[in-house]
Structures are given as structure tokens and as C-alpha cells.
Amino acid sequence: RADPFIFKHTDGYYYFTASHTDAEHNLDGKYQYRKILIRRAASINDLSDSVGNYSERCVYEREPICGNRSPHIWAPEIHFIRGKWYIYFTTTVSDTDVWQIRPHALCCDGDPMTDEWTNLGPIKTSVEGSRAFTDFSLDHTVFEHHGELYMLWAQKVTQDSDIYIARMSDPTTICTEMVLLTRPEYDWERFGFAVNEGPSIIKHGGKIFMVFSCSGTDARYCLGMMYIDENADVLDASAWTKLSHPVFTMCRENKQFGPGHNSFTRSEDDRFD
């Protein structure tokens, strides 16, 4: 499945979600992504289809408009924030334009595998006149730093897909103006399409690292990286350093193509990220 996300909770279980398609097509011949499934297992290996030692549940489903427009439910992520479970995902918001997609959220305040999930609707901004989420927007992720929540996401303010950051007042509302962190500038970020998307955060060695996806979603899809000192202001774009080369690309020898939109999780013994 595309856009895999794995979260290790304090209960010792791994929770997995990803973009899911049942391989059915709409009338335009496009794959339909209309469900959000979550899996839970005691190990990362147990999450795989081949092992199958997991429990799985559909927590959200949306039928195509008029039967022919895919709702484009993409890139779900499952997070546990301040005592509640959240699933962040992207979906279509228009009855006429399948490409009008925006960030959304679900919430569960009980057992994510058995209790009800509530649709909280689109992610909001409290900043009057902000451009946030007014254009093609997707791949939002959330991280906590020094007691504050921050959201990263990709948005097409121009023809390119860029990555932005903002501070949050709660898990579904940003409360500062969006700050541009990176836009596609190198050749390896512009194969097929000029794209920076799919940000993912990991903290290590006194730094915060953001790994992100670049180029179109074909064999040349790859990963770039930026980092910042953990004591710097994450909303200060000038404090971030962007590598001029990709950190993960296709390997013809190993027949691995299009590595993109990753996530990070903890090892079973909690020694490694």
C-alpha cells in the first residue's frame, strides 16, 4: 500500500494505516481510494499481509460522488495526541472537481479498534485571510515540540507543490500564518512534476529532521531531507538546512523503484527509531 504510516503506542502495539484501494476504477479509469483501514499488531512484521497476525478495522468509508468520482482518501496517519486518537487524511471536498482535496481529521477517545471514530471535518486556520488550505493541500502531519503542536503539509499555492509549517492551537486548527519551508528547486525534485510533499518528522541527536517526498509518483519518486537544531524556532524557515541531494532513491540493481512518502516508528525494544 502507498503512503504507509506506523505508530508505536505506549500499549506496546503497532498501529498501521496507508492509502488503500480495492483496485476498482471509477468511470474515468482511475483507482478509487475510498476507505481508511487501521491494523494493530504486536510487532512490525506481524502487520504484513504475508504474516497476517494482526487485527484490522475500517474506520471511515466514503462512496464516490454519483458513483464515478473517487473521493481520493489519501495518506492517512494515526497519532495519539493528549489522550485521544487522531487520524489525519486528505479527501475531495467538491462535488464537481475531484482534484479539490483538503486535509481532514477523525478522532476517537477510546479504543481505536473497537470504539467510534468521529469525523471532525477539514483542518482549519484561525488566521484571518490566510492562504492555508485554500488550494490543493495534502499530506499533513503533526508533531509536538517544547509543549506546542505543529502541522506540516504540502500545498500548491503556485503550480508547484511546496511544504508549509504552522503552529496549532488544538489538533485540528492552525493558529499562525503558514511558513514556506521548502519548494522543489533541484532536478531530482522535479522529475515528472515539481513536487515536495509527504513530510515526516524524526528527532535525534539534538536535531529535528524532516524527510519529504519529491517529484512525480513514478520510479523516480525519492526522498529529500531538511533539519534544524532542536532549540531553534521551527517556524523560522532560515533556521532549517536543506540537503542538496536526495537521501533515498530508486535502485535498479535491487529492483526497488519510487521510494517515497515514508514514516518513522520505534523498534520493538525501544532502543531505536
What are these regions (language model features)?
Residues 1-273:
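Carbohydrate-active catalytic/glycan-binding domains of CAZyme proteins
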